[in-house]
Amino acid sequence: MLHTFVAYVEDLPGVLTRVASLFRRLNININSLTVGRSERPGLSRLTLVCEASAEAGDRIRASLYKLENVVDVDDIAQAPSVTRELALIKVAATPRNRAQIFDLVEVFRARIVDLTSESLMIEMTGVESKIEGLIEVLREDEGRILEICRSGKMTMRRGHHVSSVVKAMGVGDAADEEMTVEESAADEV
């Protein structure tokens, strides 16, 4: 079962090491990890994706919450959410194949962010399968891909639901009361 944990952690040295050490101790591989500043100064938002049983997922969530400097944790894999990933893909581009690459970029709704006489860099944001699709097509021409950099998954719940940390800041209280029946039912699953 795939788990997507969203945690708010204090912006302090060693926090990421503690999180990674927990997964090492549990012998669970981290499939994706992103960390960045949140809407609250001094806190970062950590999104972590892993494969584990439902029972192990519950243990992971509880263990994450017990870690020093972890303020809030939620497993939102089953919740209605939006997940995106960013990829930068540098490809070899000659005048002969450049038009073909431009067409491919347009089909995948990506964009060119850097262009030289010998290469170009593609930026693409989307779901993992869409990014994998572009990479697969680019790999059909051996030697075309020079370098790939991917962000990892970023996930946020749909609708008005916000974490308890955001609620404590006074944001989203009224919005939570307006949650639709559909969102409420999805939260109970």
What is the predicted function of each stretch?
Residues 1-4, 8-45, 49-189:
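Long, contiguous binding/interaction regions
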